[in-house]
């Protein structure tokens, strides 16, 4: 069970999710895909309506393996943890912008910049659905709201989670975002 968790001192919630992983691994059709999968940590975040969201942070190299079984795994974990939306995110590192005075050691890769990491978090949040467009609205006070347009073909799978996605992204990055599915009126 603790072989599924990569952190040294797992919390009670992480142990419960690891146990759920082990239980799901006992099913023959998921066994091969779930055996190598591990996660680093889990954050439980309160969202609107008294619901909670579980953000499961996974190592970036194993994200592709998670994507293969993510829809099924999410469905099964949401059954085991009712009133919680489950989201899988890669745990990415943001390197600080190099100071002008600092000696140039190594160029900071684009994948470690704040913008790139926040964009990847957005893609991970809405995974089965694709992002088809982004718009930025500037408010009078100088605040920005990012409007994210999602593909309408997967709208039934993600529609009920849009508020959770919005709250999660806001808590993780501090940026305001609005998710919209074109062709639907809200």
Swiss-Prot record:
Disulfide bonds: none
GO cellular component, one term: cytosolic small ribosomal subunit
Compartment(s): Cytoplasm
GO biological process: ribosomal small subunit biogenesis; rRNA processing; translation
Molecular function (Gene Ontology), one example: structural constituent of ribosome
Alphabetic keyword roster: Cytoplasm, Ribonucleoprotein, Ribosomal protein
Cited InterPro entries: Ribosomal_eS7 (IPR000554), Ribosomal_eS7_CS (IPR047861)
Similarity comment text for this entry: Belongs to the eukaryotic ribosomal protein eS7 family.
PANTHER family in the cross-refs: 40S RIBOSOMAL PROTEIN S7, SMALL RIBOSOMAL SUBUNIT PROTEIN ES7
Subunit structure: Component of the small ribosomal subunit. Mature ribosomes consist of a small (40S) and a large (60S) subunit. The 40S subunit contains about 32 different proteins and 1 molecule of RNA (18S). The 60S subunit contains 45 different proteins and 3 molecules of RNA (25S, 5.8S and 5S).
Function: Component of the ribosome, a large ribonucleoprotein complex responsible for the synthesis of proteins in the cell. The small ribosomal subunit (SSU) binds messenger RNAs (mRNAs) and translates the encoded message by selecting cognate aminoacyl-transfer RNA (tRNA) molecules. The large subunit (LSU) contains the ribosomal catalytic site termed the peptidyl transferase center (PTC), which catalyzes the formation of peptide bonds, thereby polymerizing the amino acids delivered by tRNAs into a polypeptide chain.
Name of this protein: Small ribosomal subunit protein eS7
Organism: Candida albicans (strain SC5314 / ATCC MYA-2876)
The organism's taxonomic lineage, starting at the top: Eukaryota, Fungi, Dikarya, Ascomycota, Saccharomycotina
Gene responsible for this protein: RPS7A
